[in-house]
Amino acid sequence: MSIEKQVAEQLLEIKAVFLKPNEPFTWASGIKSPIYCDNRLTLGFPKVRQFIAKSLAEKIKQTFGEVDVVAGTATAGIPHAAWVSDLLDLPMVYVRSKAKEHGKGNQIEGPISKGQKVVVIEDLISTGGSSLKAVEALEEAGAEVVGIAAIFTYGLAKGKQLLEESGTKLVTLTNYDELIEVALNENYVTGEDMETLKEWKKNPENWGK
């Protein structure tokens, strides 16, 4: 069984995926969605989070080769970055969405040096905006960001475009298309739900308006 399918099954089993076609979720970007994937719930399931950490570590080695630092995005990417950095025996930092307004005013917590190769860990990619803010902060600090590794991506056109424009490589363990296919095959959703989910993916910005 592929990693994509295994992770999709695990997210469904631990009820990290919520479906509400008639009462859609509203994302921070303003997009309305019939589905919400809450990967923070993986923290409560040791076997699932261990599998995710191991799979992310393998993906990073296969895709990016040797890196110097693992960076987690605040807040959801932090625990996964910690477990992955342990497995790879690498230093870890985390990146806030913006600099603190008190103390040292840091946006990046943890030591980072000019020229270090950094991989960013995200729990989820939607439009990609928050991930790219972390990439930008790290590059401004002098790091060389080799790419982003995430658990899940919705695979939205806007997110793909932003990543391509920034020249940032993305690898993920699973994705929206795989998730809804597994959900249908294992009776988490109906055929009618599936049509709604496919329609949303075609035009998420205008869906439900």
Curated annotation (Swiss-Prot):
The protein, known as: Orotate phosphoribosyltransferase
SUPFAM superfamilies per the UniProt record, alphabetical: PRTase-like
Reactions catalysed: orotidine 5'-phosphate + diphosphate = orotate + 5-phospho-alpha-D-ribose 1-diphosphate
Binding site for orotate: 126
InterPro entries on file: OPRT, Or_phspho_trans_dom, PRibTrfase_dom, PRTase-like
Family listed: Belongs to the purine/pyrimidine phosphoribosyltransferase family. PyrE subfamily.
Annotated CDD domains: PRTases_typeI
Gene that specifies this protein: pyrE
Entry-linked HAMAP family: PyrE
Residues bound to 5-phospho-alpha-D-ribose 1-diphosphate: 96, 100, 102, 122-130
